[in-house]
Each structure stands twice: as C-alpha cells, then as structure tokens.
Design a protein with these regions (language model features):
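Active-site cofactor/cluster-binding pocket
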Residues: 5, 10-207
Length: 207
C-alpha cells in the first residue's frame, strides 16, 4: 500500500532521477582475483542421496534478501519434485535485525517430520552476516564433521558503534568461533559485500 514510502517507515526515502553509483576505477586487482576464482568452472557436485533431509541454515539481517534465498531454495526443491519445509525466524527484523532461516529438503514431503532443524543437524550454514552467524541460534545447529559453512566476512556495523564510535569489530574472534564449531576444513569465508558492490554498485546483491 506504499505506506512506508508515504512516511510510515522512517527508514524509507524516495530518490527521484537517481542512479546506482558504480566505482569509477573499476574492480581492483584483489577483487578481480577473488571474482575470477569464484567463477572458475566448477565440477558437478556430488548430490546427497536424501536418505535423510538435507538441512540448511541461512543467517543474515532483515531487508537484505535472506528470505528470498530461502524461497529460491524451496522453489527449486518443489520444481524437482522433492519435499521441502522452511521456517523464518525474523522477529522484528524488518530492517537490519537478525534473521535465521531453516530450509529442509527431503526426497518426499513425508520424509520431513518437523520444520525446525534439530541441534547439530545442519548440513550447510549460509552466513550472509558474520554477527548473526555466530549467535547461539545458528551455532547450535552446526556440528563438526557434518556442517559446511560459507560465510560473508564483511564487517557490518552494529548498534554498538552508535554508542561507542571507537568500538572495534571482532571479526577475527567471530571467524574463530565459526571455525571452532564447524572445523576449519568445513569453513569458507568470502567478502561477498565488497565483490557485489564492485561488480554491481550495490551491496544488496551480495546475498
């Protein structure tokens, strides 16, 4: 109903005649190397047999496409004739609050007995935000030797930076926690925000 654009949501503004700003210098060599590696020809994956449901936890913040990622996976499973169940824990996270989504894919719908992923049974952790990824809700679902984690390592300021301008982002400590819970062999960290901004002019495409 466009109520947010009419002033109901203070975070909404209307830009008339604006265009996305793209870096004038293009992609730096470091980013170019990362992009080249990411888009190298990939081997076909070994798909799970789905003797048990395949469980994915997606973490991020509101308004950045986390629920869209969840919906895309669910629709892909539906198109392939598989069973699927999703649960999105959003709370009040309309804009930049924590979001944790559960996606379960099974051979048949009857194979999925519950929507919520049990503790320690996540097969994949997609971390769109490092802070939310290290929360109890997300870390409680992973298991060393079972879970693979792909996490965006970009530093996104939290409310702590409003209260303390000198606050430091504990990137190393949070990455260490993910590696401790999942195992270093199962962790992959990329600066998806930087790559998306360099390629498309907007970090919203990082997810």
């Amino acid at each position: 109903d466009y109520s947010c654009a009419n002033g109901f949501c203070p975070s909404f503004v209307t830009v008339v005649g604006g265009q996305l700003k793209k870096p004038s210098a293009g992609i730096d060599s470091g980013t170019a190397d990362k992009v080249e590696t990411l888009f190298d020809p990939l081997p076909e994956p070994t798909l799970p047999t789905l003797d048990r449901p395949w469980n994915t936890v997606v973490t991020g913040v509101g308004g950045t496409g986390v629920l869209t990622v969840t919906a895309l996976v669910a629709m892909a499973a539906h198109v392939e004739g598989k069973g699927c169940a999703t649960m999105n824990q959003t709370g009040l996270a309309q804009k930049f609050g924590a979001v944790v989504s559960h996606v379960r894919v099974g051979r048949d719908q009857e194979d999925i007995r519950a929507v919520r992923i049990p503790a320690g049974e996540a097969d994949l952790l997609l971390g769109a935000d490092l802070v939310v990824t290290t929360t109890y809700e997300a870390m409680g679902k992973v298991a060393r030797g079972r879970t693979h984690a792909v996490v965006n390592e970009a530093e996104v300021p939290t409310a702590a930076f409003i209260l303390d301008p000198d606050a430091r982002f504990p990137t190393a400590a949070m990455k260490d926690r993910v590696e401790t819970e999942v195992g270093s062999d199962g962790c992959h960290f990329i600066d998806a925000t930087h790559i998306a901004t360099a390629l498309l002019g907007d970090s919203i495409a990082s997810n």
